[in-house]
Amino acid sequence: TGAICVYHEMINPAVTALSSSGIPVAAVSTGFPAGLSPFHLRVAEIEQSVAAGAEEIDIVISRRHALSGDWRALYDEVRSFRAAAGHAHLKTILATGELGTLRNVARASMVCMMAGADFIKTSTGKESVNATLPVSLVMLRAIRTYFERTGYRVGYKPAGGLSKAKDALVYLSLIKEELGPRWL
């Protein structure tokens, strides 16, 4: 079941409104959409969101780590977010339109999965470039490689720019071709 995603301040009303529906609540955290708030505040926001009832946490990576090639810093950051999220699913938003190259997208995808991401997501939906097919292909192939090496199935979410059913069908077809029907 897909979750309803809200800002941290809206978790309590969302949990209350959805309490008997079986629909989980997700929260955008870590200074969404820029991800530039101080590290300790980003970690605290994740912890507070989980405590308030969020079952999924969407985090925004620090793009500066990818752009500077500091993959260890990105790993450590996402690993800390994973620990703060506890039992909640962790979705890492790569903001691919701001990563500069497909190579950075591939590396950021792999680093986030290695650090414990349950999903990797293209965009916040606020960037000037959101989900694209080339970026999605790179991310899906990273997921496939990670699965082949670890046996762990990581989810994928395209975000931003998908406004029609036919847009979604293109991405569903790509996912099915690259990963197979179990990812649908």
Give residue spans per PLM region.
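Alpha/beta enzyme core
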Residues: 1-3, 9-156, 163-184
